[in-house]
């Protein structure tokens, strides 16, 4: 996309959409992983590094303290969360996040003590990235949940919210744009499934609300059937 839409790409680069999710690295992790500790409800969590990898020592699914590797960052501001891989293709969101405005660790549940067997515990389904969060932080997300085994084989085209997340599949548009302008055929919306200019209020809702709203997902997103209202 950047080859033709350089200014749009420049504005997107390092935006909230670009930083919606990323691989944990020196440049993407904002939290203090230099031995910082945070205590809540009697549980002390420690954040540290080993070589170029990031870890947290905290309460696990059995109620015992364990070591967990942080593989991905989630979001950028005003807070950044961290995702930990679990068996079955699952990614789980830690309940402690980094406050990027005050440069401190804080809990997302300050007034609640959540037991390890609770649905809301960070290792359980309530904090499962695949089912609860993934669709709106990556592009062309396919959960690939297997109900028989209870496992995920989740895939994406782009790890973050990239061009096709809002504009829809772009291959037809790219093929059209690659032809000499004088030889291009006349096609609807320059080959894109989603109309994204000169929108009325309802069209804006249909385009943005699938993610910027409190709702529940019942199937993988389909740009050709995106109407909410």
Please describe what each predicted stretch is.
Residues 91-93, 207:
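Short hydrophobic-aromatic micro-motifs
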Residues 6-75, 81-86, 103, 107-119, ...:
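Primarily the internal scaffold of c-type cytochrome electron-transfer domains
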Residues 122-130, 201:
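Short acidic-aromatic active-site loops that bind/stabilize oxyanions
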Residues 128-143:
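C-terminal substrate/ligand-recognition segments
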Residues 88-91, 100:
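Conserved oxyanion/phosphate-binding beta-strand-loop segments in alpha/beta enzyme cores
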